[in-house]
Amino acid sequence: MSIKSDKWIRRMAQESGMIEPFEPGQVRQSADGQKIVSYGTSSYGYDIRCAREFKVFTNIYSTVVDPKNFDEKSFVDIESDVCIIPPNSFALARTMEYFRIPRNVLTICLGKSTYARCGIIVNVTPFEPEWEGYVTLEFSNTTPLPAKIYAGEGCAQVLFFESDEVCETSYRDRGGKYQGQTGVTLPKT
């Protein structure tokens, strides 16, 4: 299994629709010249962007967080260019990009250091072979202060690994529960 380069990522995105919309280069400034958290193709990965759709964790109803019986009232829905995450809390978001992962590819998604250096941790599970959809992102604010996330800017990097042999059973074959997700998706069992 080997990590894939910028040339491979560009080819797969442009010929197979692996990433849509796709940015073939690295964007570091907004259209009006403002500095932003970079996104797009890097040497050995792709920096994904956060969309304007957020679910911010709240303790208004004092419910228990149970992954087997998750209460949607635990979140407040926000649509904005920025999301403020309360101290020691977290938020869910989704990528602007839609992914179609090939059958012989597995990805690993890592947070960007720009956010990590501010105490904001991004967690995303691997994108399995033949998974497709918008990625649900998990942001944890580990600080005692409110933290800001920017929509339309880079938030994490996806690394692509191509296997020497095709898997016997893909995510699609298993009927994976998060297949084809279109928005921020809460836990399913």
Swiss-Prot record:
<dbReference type="InterPro" id="IPR011962">
    <property type="entry name" value="dCTP_deaminase"/>
</dbReference>
<keyword id="KW-0378">Hydrolase</keyword>
<comment type="pathway">
    <text>Pyrimidine metabolism; dUMP biosynthesis; dUMP from dCTP (dUTP route): step 1/2.</text>
</comment>
<dbReference type="GO" id="GO:0000166">
    <property type="term" value="F:nucleotide binding"/>
</dbReference>
<keyword id="KW-0547">Nucleotide-binding</keyword>
<protein>
    <recommendedName>
        <fullName>dCTP deaminase</fullName>
        <ecNumber>3.5.4.13</ecNumber>
    </recommendedName>
</protein>
<feature type="active site" description="Proton donor/acceptor">
    <location>
        <position position="138"/>
    </location>
</feature>
<dbReference type="GO" id="GO:0006226">
    <property type="term" value="P:dUMP biosynthetic process"/>
</dbReference>
<comment type="function">
    <text>Catalyzes the deamination of dCTP to dUTP.</text>
</comment>
<feature type="binding site">
    <location>
        <begin position="112"/>
        <end position="117"/>
    </location>
    <ligand>
        <name>dCTP</name>
    </ligand>
</feature>
<dbReference type="GO" id="GO:0008829">
    <property type="term" value="F:dCTP deaminase activity"/>
</dbReference>
<dbReference type="GO" id="GO:0015949">
    <property type="term" value="P:nucleobase-containing small molecule interconversion"/>
</dbReference>
<comment type="similarity">
    <text>Belongs to the dCTP deaminase family.</text>
</comment>
<dbReference type="GO" id="GO:0006229">
    <property type="term" value="P:dUTP biosynthetic process"/>
</dbReference>
<dbReference type="InterPro" id="IPR036157">
    <property type="entry name" value="dUTPase-like_sf"/>
</dbReference>
<keyword id="KW-0546">Nucleotide metabolism</keyword>
<feature type="binding site">
    <location>
        <position position="157"/>
    </location>
    <ligand>
        <name>dCTP</name>
    </ligand>
</feature>
<dbReference type="InterPro" id="IPR033704">
    <property type="entry name" value="dUTPase_trimeric"/>
</dbReference>
<comment type="subunit">
    <text>Homotrimer.</text>
</comment>
<feature type="binding site">
    <location>
        <position position="171"/>
    </location>
    <ligand>
        <name>dCTP</name>
    </ligand>
</feature>
<feature type="binding site">
    <location>
        <begin position="136"/>
        <end position="138"/>
    </location>
    <ligand>
        <name>dCTP</name>
    </ligand>
</feature>
<dbReference type="Pfam" id="PF22769">
    <property type="entry name" value="DCD"/>
</dbReference>
<feature type="binding site">
    <location>
        <position position="181"/>
    </location>
    <ligand>
        <name>dCTP</name>
    </ligand>
</feature>
